């Protein structure tokens, strides 16, 4: 049952066209799975995010944030409370050797803007399918580069709706981790300090990384990206491959035969299929090698109700 009081309160804080009720979230995830959100809002201004977060905090209403849904699994039971999509906070500005980008801007697009201005440092991100907010949240990286290498600061909002500006040091960026996760903050925008370079060399590096990515990753299927973090001294994909799990399927989801670190939706798979396959892979690798595989992908939402 959707709470009409919450709906009416949201209408006072944000234009009605930015509010959706009982919205299917599978429309917004790379896996094409997920239940409905009680309220799904799409703010276009930082102050709108702040206002909604402050209202939710004061009224003890849970808030969930979504970027472009590339490294997340949403259960079929959906998400209660308010889901805030940050995708419309997608501005990208260039000033000298710095780029400021909104949380919803695709990090791929930001890397391309950097190239167009002959700025080097974001080439590693040319194939990462996440948003700026998600990239900072998990210190995204690929092919030897990571957000930590070039970020200057992040402007965030806390659980009370107040703005917090964090420097690189204050962000405590580590392998797939940050203070943002620990303090339950959300990124509104981030600034990156880059270096002058040659556009032809930057493009050549991006072309090389794109070719490597396309040749190794199962981009032809819906997926949640890299499922597991890299265990110290090992590669998750190699452990899964050596456990003979490539091609193993539960429901409509299988361990990719192209890259064992990915799970792909090959036949109308569900979030439950993903979650069950993840647990099975973790259990199998643990039994065979004694190594715990920790998830890189986030799993959120409620389990579906049993019929």
Curated annotation (Swiss-Prot):
It is found in: Cytoplasm. GO terms for biological process: cell division; cell wall organization; peptidoglycan biosynthetic process; regulation of cell shape. It is an enzyme of class 1 (oxidoreductase). Its EC number is 1.3.1.98. Transmembrane segments: none annotated. Keywords: Cell cycle, Cell division, Cell shape, Cell wall biogenesis/degradation, Cytoplasm, FAD, Flavoprotein, NADP, Oxidoreductase, Peptidoglycan synthesis. HAMAP family: MurB (MF_00037). PANTHER family: UDP-N-ACETYLENOLPYRUVOYLGLUCOSAMINE REDUCTASE. NCBIfam families: murB (TIGR00179), PRK13905.1 (NF010480). Belongs to the MurB family. This is UDP-N-acetylenolpyruvoylglucosamine reductase. It comes from Staphylococcus aureus (strain MRSA252). The gene is murB.
């Amino acid at each position: 049952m959707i709470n009409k009081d919450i709906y009416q309160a949201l209408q006072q804080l944000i234009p009605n066209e930015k509010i959706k009720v009982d919205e299917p979230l599978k429309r917004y995830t790379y896996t094409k799975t997920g239940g409905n959100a009680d309220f799904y809002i799409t703010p276009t201004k930082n102050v709108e995010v702040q206002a909604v977060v402050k209202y939710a905090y004061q009224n003890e209403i849970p808030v969930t944030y979504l970027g472009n849904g590339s490294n997340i699994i949403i259960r079929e039971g959906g998400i209660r409370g308010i889901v805030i999509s940050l995708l419309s906070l997608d501005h990208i500005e260039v000033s000298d050797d710095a780029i400021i980008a909104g949380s919803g801007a695709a990090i791929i697009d930001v890397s391309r803007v950097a190239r167009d201005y002959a700025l080097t440092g974001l080439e590693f991100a040319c194939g990462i399918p996440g948003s700026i907010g998600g990239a900072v949240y998990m210190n995204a990286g690929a092919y030897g580069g990571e957000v930590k290498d070039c970020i200057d600061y992040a402007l965030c909002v806390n659980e009370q709706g107040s703005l917090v500006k964090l420097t690189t040091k204050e962000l405590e960026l580590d392998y797939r981790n940050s203070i943002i996760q620990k303090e339950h903050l959300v990124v509104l925008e981030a600034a990156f300090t880059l270096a002058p370079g040659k556009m032809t060399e930057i493009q050549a590096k991006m072309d090389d990384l794109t070719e490597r990515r396309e040749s190794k990753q199962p981009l032809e299927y819906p997926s949640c990206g890299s499922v597991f973090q890299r265990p110290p001294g090992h590669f998750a994909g190699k452990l899964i491959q050596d456990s003979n799990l490539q091609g193993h399927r539960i429901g409509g989801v299988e361990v990719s035969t192209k890259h064992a670190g990915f799970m792909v939706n090959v036949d109308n798979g569900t979030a439950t299929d993903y979650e069950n396959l993840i647990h099975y892979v973790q259990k199998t690798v643990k039994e065979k090698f004694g190594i715990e595989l920790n998830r890189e992908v986030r799993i959120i939402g409620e389990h579906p109700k049993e019929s």
